[in-house]
Design a protein with these regions (language model features):
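Active-/binding-site microenvironments in catalytic and ligand-binding cores
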Residues: 1-267
């Protein structure tokens, strides 16, 4: 145990989350992030002069860096495990497959830098990451994907974070894997996959977020969680391929997702 603690004292930690603020880039399909002070310093004072401030936050659970629960997407009325969506859904949330059922992550993470594989800083907005791209990137990284891993796919898209319309991909699309790439990844049985973009998967130019086949393949057909809007730039720049991945969703009973602050740890 002593040796373990001494190793962690030297650990390097990468924060893989984007900051949350009013007006941040996000999917147009979800309630925007808003935060206001509910009580300001000086509104209420104790007899000794003490004061406190607090806020109210309103946001969709799929805004900012977040993870999808398996209740997030259905196909022809069915959720993962052939569960009828209507039978477990109410105005208060889901009685099955909610985010509270997702255990914390403490596992091996694998980074696939597809932009580097192509020799570019950022993949084009309308680029679909193919099976050949994934295979080539994995081979170049001299690693493998094991069952239960978390696989992070970098397109360099977080370099566009400050350009809201471009980052959201509404007009020009966003890079990501397509259905074929999702099927290939699912065959390796990762516990979750993530990327820098809002939707994780390829968004064709001009189509917006209307068609998301990768969500069906992962969430409905294979029970693989999706982590979106990640900040991977520093991890990519470090040159690491394998790392300890840490993530814990909020314990929101019946919710279809949760904001998260994932970490990559090098020991």
């Amino acid at each position: 145990m002593i040796d373990t603690w001494s190793q962690f004292k030297k650990a390097r930690i990468f924060d893989l989350s984007q900051p949350m603020f009013r007006g941040m880039p996000q999917s147009p399909n979800h309630t925007p992030f808003r935060m206001v002070l509910d009580r300001r310093h000086g509104d209420i004072l104790s007899s000794e002069g003490d004061s406190a401030s607090n806020e109210i936050v309103v946001t969709g659970c799929h805004v900012g860096t977040h993870i999808d629960a398996l209740s997030h997407v259905s196909f022809k009325g069915k959720l993962y495990g052939d569960i009828d969506a209507n039978s477990v859904m109410s105005h208060t949330g889901f009685s099955a497959l909610g985010i509270e059922t997702v255990a914390s992550f403490l596992c091996r993470g694998v980074l696939l830098d597809v932009a580097k594989f192509h020799g570019v800083k950022i993949l084009p907005a309308d680029y679909e990451i193919t099976v050949s791209d994934l295979e080539g990137t994995l081979k170049a990284a001299q690693t493998q994907i094991n069952e239960g891993d978390v696989v992070l796919i970098s397109s360099g898209w977080d370099h566009n974070w400050s350009e809201k319309e471009l980052f959201q991909g509404q007009l020009h699309g966003a890079p990501g894997i397509g259905e074929a790439g999702a099927i290939w990844l699912a065959a390796h049985k990762p516990r979750a996959c993530g990327s820098e973009t809002i939707a994780f998967e390829h968004i064709p130019s001009g189509l917006g977020h209307r068609k998301l086949p990768v969500h069906r393949v992962f969430l409905v057909e294979n029970g693989i969680h999706i982590i979106e809007t990640m900040k991977l730039r520093e991890l990519v720049q470090s040159g690491v391929v394998e790392f300890l991945f840490v993530l814990s969703p909020l314990n929101l009973v019946g919710a279809t997702g949760s904001p998260v602050r994932p970490l990559a740890v090098l020991v």
